[in-house]
UniProtKB/Swiss-Prot annotation:
Protein name: Serine/threonine-protein kinase VPS15
HEAT repeats: 383-421, 480-517, 524-562, 610-646, 648-685, 687-724, 727-764
Reported modifications of this chain: Autophosphorylated.
UniProt-listed Enzyme Commission number(s): 2.7.11.1
Record's catalysed reaction(s): L-seryl-[protein] + ATP = O-phospho-L-seryl-[protein] + ADP + H(+); L-threonyl-[protein] + ATP = O-phospho-L-threonyl-[protein] + ADP + H(+)
Domain (Protein kinase) ranges: 27-307
Tissue-specificity statement: Mainly expressed in anthers, pollen grains and pollen tubes, and, to a lower extent, in other tissues and organs including seedlings, roots, stems, leaves, flowers, pitils and siliques.
Lipid attachment in record (N-myristoyl glycine): 2
WD repeats, residue ranges: 1079-1118, 1127-1166, 1184-1226, 1231-1270, 1276-1323, 1371-1409, 1466-1494
PROSITE patterns (UniProt xref): HEAT_REPEAT (PS50077), PROTEIN_KINASE_DOM (PS50011), PROTEIN_KINASE_ST (PS00108), WD_REPEATS_2 (PS50082), WD_REPEATS_REGION (PS50294)
This protein's record includes keyword Kinase: yes
Amino acid sequence: MGNKIARTTQVSATEYYLHDLPSSYNLVLKEVLGRGRFLKSIQCKHDEGLVVVKVYFKRGDSIDLREYERRLVKIKDVFLSLEHPHVWPFQFWQETDKAAYLVRQYFYSNLHDRLSTRPFLSLVEKKWLAFQLLLAVKQCHEKDICHGDIKCENVLLTSWNWLYLADFASFKPTYIPYDDPSDFSFFFDTRGQRLCYLAPERFYEHGGETQVAQDAPLKPSMDIFAVGCVIAELFLEGQPLFELAQLLAYRRGQHDPSQHLEKIPDPGIRKMILHMIQLEPEARLSAEDYLQNYVGVVFPNYFSPFLHTLYCCWNPLPSDMRVATCQGIFQEILKKMMENKSGDEIGVDSPVTSNPMNASTVQETFANHKLNSSKDLIRNTVNSKDEIFYSISDALKKNRHPFLKKITMDDLGTLMSLYDSRSDTYGTPFLPVEGNMRCEGMVLIASMLCSCIRNIKLPHLRREAILLLRSCSLYIDDDDRLQRVLPYVVALLSDPTAIVRCAAMETLCDILPLVRDFPPSDAKIFPEYIFPMLSMLPEDTEESVRICYASNIAKLALTAYGFLIHSFQLSDVGVLNELNSQQISTTPASETPSHLQKANGNAQLQQLRKTIAEVVQELVMGPKQTPNVRRALLQDIGELCFFFGQRQSNDFLLPILPAFLNDRDEQLRSVFFEKIVYVCFFVGQRSVEEYLLPYIDQALSDQTEAVIVNALECLSTLCKSSFLRKRALLQMIECVYPLLCYPSQWVRRAVVTFIAASSECLGAVDSYAFIAPVIRSYLSRLPASIASEEGLLSCLKPPVTREVVYRIFEKTRNPEFMAKQRKMWYSSSPQSKDWESVDLFDKDAGELNSVECRAEQKQSVEGKKQIKSASKQPEVQGKYAEKDAKLRIPRNPRPNASNTVELRDPVYPEKLQFSGFMAPYVSGANSFIEPENIPLYSFSMDKRAATNPPVASESSLQMNSLGMGSLSVPWMDSMSKSFNLASSVPVPKLISGSFHVGTNPKQFYRVVHEPESRENDQISSAISKFQDLGVSSSSKSASVTSEDASSPADLVGEPSLSRTSVPDSGWKPRGVLVAHLQEHRSAVNDIATSSDHSFFVSASDDSTVKVWDSRKLEKDISFRSRLTYHLEGSRGMCTTMLRNSTQVVVGASDGVIHMFSIDHISRGLGNVVEKYSGIVDIKKKDVKEGALVSLLNYTADSLSGPMVMYSTQNCGIHLWDTRSDLDAWTLKANPEEGYVSSLVTSPCGNWFVSGSSRGVLTLWDLRFRVPVNSWQYPIICPIEKMCLCFLPPSVSVSTTMKPLIYVAAGCNEVSLWNAEGGSCHQVLRVANYENETDVSEFQWKLPSNKVNPKPNHRQNMSSKYRIEELNEPPPRLPGIRSLLPLPGGDLLTGGTDLKIRRWDYSSPERSYCICGPSLKGVGNDDFYELKTNTGVQFVQETKRRPLATKLTAKAVLAAAATDTAGCHRDSVQSLASVKLNQRLLISSSRDGAIKVWK
């Protein structure tokens, strides 16, 4: 094919290249490739992609091309049988009258182009390409095919470094003349540079001894020589081994290429190349022999068969599947590459003992993958992603830069020694990385991942690809990290998916600190490349991305700082800023290179700090700042201080700190005071005392215990480091000491730690001079050493309520009061201070008793006098100095009422003196509910014990407080470790946290306490001991006798009466309409109020949740909602607000729980304006069990986090810990009982009751998560609503300690049930309505069985599956739809009769209708009568004048339409209350109206 033509006519017009080609090929010329003279190469567009067309133009005599076509057919057919080919023959050819066309697929890159393209090939990549080139030649020679023109242009490469050998030259001459270079230039010189890859034996001389035919067959040794030339050029960075003249000289023995090959550092590669280019063809080995002989010398062992087989399996897969499979076997790839390294590679610390993964294992893995779908494969591999990174976590930790690790308290000393506040720069060495982490084979995996990452369709697989790149970056060199991996990671910072952007950010911040060295061209990578690409992240629409940026900004800043320092080191050795000697000699001393460099370095550092400061300010104070972003930024505030230095930390960081505290998020405030200690160490002593200590002082009166504790721990750290001056330290002690009586043990321990640290800092003399007088009133006795935490804890008096503590704080803010108090502290004698509180207690006794109008008032006063007289005895005074104080109890106490002393201590302002508000005989007790007053204490005491305290008794009781001040009694030894009970002493009963010792069955005492949010690990053992004594730890406020408390089953507990959750006792709404809110377009199903009653939210069927400002209810005439949250088309079924937060949880009809936070700035002191800035979406949880039916707050104890209990349409009951996405537990109700329509939980969190849509009520024990009791409501109807019953204190404990609940079901009736036995106590009902049933028809007293003993199978199936309901669904009975419990057992109800009623528990006849329509001619002449039937009390509302007919729904609606008092005009769906200047009632109805009453 053209071997006999000397030259052809030059074709100049490219439009004629495809003129003779049939139009069926659909080819469009794109550009001309190369400078070939024999074949013209052009790039064309085809319907299926780009192709390369090589055109041969016929000139002169006609030539028969059929022989060459036969050779092309043979080559194509032979290579079709290859399983994993490295050869790429021509795919199509066409001969016309004027030309011949050869067509193959276009490849973006060949070896010649790749050698000059960044990122440049690494050593292992070059070996991998050489390995594949030998494999390609081996495949050809095994099929008896020789290429004939192997050169860099004919070696094609994919983006993942898979090699193909193309453009087989079966139509080119085998031999060419030695003395005529024209043939060489015509056939083989495509670049015009006269580079020669032909074997020497392919040149012949005219007239020589041996005559050869130009078309003689090619030999394999000729291809081996060309392969050697290509491999040499590969390792010589693109420099050719031979030009034509050099090759001819080498043929004559006049040229030695070994000198040129000395530039290759690997001797094994040089040896292999020299062996391939020998002059003697017979001395050259076959391609297979070279592959076998140089394994372990040139080619790593894992190349074949492991890595090659792996690539063969990856080639046919799409990008998503490649990443998924790579992730699944990444560990095996790493192990295999780390084994048996070749050459001088450094091994790992210990050999890998696991079995190696061979080629068969790889093939089996991919074969199994092919059996599954792509989605299953991706799912299985993605689930194991954590296994990849656990194995390298230690490596990441070892190789992190020293100043990039988290700064701990122990590191502060070392960090401050590293930190030089004077120079403020250039003080840290650059990033060291250990060499044992090197694994050069990881570059190949990284290249494959980079080639796939742009084509991955699934976002989570793009994320996994980035994380795999992060893993590979641990084992590759710096150049590959910067040139190969980093550009792809940075490009994905603008990915449309948030999780991909977060992963790219994390990977970027993990890769950059690993860099040890970089070229001068990358010295400004941060200011010119990294920071501009990150500039949009502070305004990212997704909060998770901003959080990720904030959590990594400190690491990024310190890494940029390290890069800057390293660039200065490069300039020191003359790499950067080179100046010639003449310029230096003529430059003044002030402008020498060292001075210029230092000035330039300071300018660059200041610019870097300015850039980071702008980012921090945008994250903290920008328009898209959130509490979560701020919290993330605070986690590394110490590293930021280190980066900014002392001056800029004062100038920049200090002014933005108030922005953190202005946020209402309690978690943010807690983290702020946890991390503020790092700022203290960097800004200096003066800044701490002037700016930061006021913040800490403010935190001490915070509502959140974690904030208080973190502030105290910060102070303790500063004291232990001697960072505070004496004056500032004493001021903080005066601010802190009231917290010694705080009800939380966690806070008290933190206060004790601070006081002990302060004492150690001041010394013994100053401690007793300044600290002891301040804290003496809070201690039962003074410890031997104030610097001892254990001693202080053992001497602490019991805690008081939060209300008392906050009043003390208000007093301490008064300068006059503090001046008076200091005079008392430092002027009084020790004796007067010891008993000052006792005198004050006695002084207020009469006032306290006057408040409590009880029959036993006289006895109580006498008891106090006895206590006072006993306290005056010297023996009693000496008792406080004893270490082991014991409670003396007579062996046979007299059972008369005069021995009972009841101490009631409400809060009075005159008792809020530091020296007097804690009486020695007043102690706290374990508690679970909020009180309204100081704890109430009662104890039985024999007069002989009071008058003769030193007398020992066999009935002495030693009680251990077990670390809980609330469990201690002043007489009892706080350091005792066990109970020592004499056999004659009655077992003490702990009722609501108080101890009662006595035998009189009529002696009972009631104690209400403040909950302890933090208790130590010994609480559980204490509770278990009390339970062994027959005492319930969950008991609540109640009056208890020895009879009533004899049964442990009675001590179930009474609900908490929190000030914020339950209306005031005795509150009686008058029915005066305050506001009418009509923004909702459909039914308002539920209302929830905030903890501080500043706002409330409403959930509606119109797919919205609206936020209303409570403070404007009584002020604004036109009242509008402040914020609106949209539920994306689903109905809002139920809602609740998490306690002590602004977070709202809403259950929707599509089964999604929406959780969001309200950005609300409440009105405080000064000129603070109340503001609702927006809604922050926190999370959405799809339960996938149908609509949400019920939703309520759940609090097991004060230690648990915010939890929500909810029920679903598919009979599921779940407890969700809102801090995670998972349920804490899940229970399943019986489907045959219907779905769970209502829930009610106990305040202690030990039990709850569920009501179903078919009238089945079930009591569940949450300790074991099993149903305890289940009973059927008297009629089969849905349980509409349930709530707890708060009985009055006068009721006996046998009743109050049982789980009592109000149940709204049936037709206009509410019943009070004891869930323990399923018995009914009381029924509240409304008469004169249709569908009502006579009372006598129901068996209210005894619970109904759900299933008959031996039912008929057919009837059972019908009853179980309610088949009749499919044909005719039962109508929903009119009745009560909303309940609001009140203290004392009272109840507010609202229902379909459009009325809201108040039912009085103690005096049922005083019940009344708050609001509702009045029937024409009848008026409100309702009265309430009591009946009894089968032992159940019935309270029934009836008309004084009987109605002729029973009321119908139409009659009620007609009356509502004409009512002028503003009553509801549709069913009342929800009730709630808020406490402002007065208590207000909020009600919502099915027509979308919300009404506020007073």
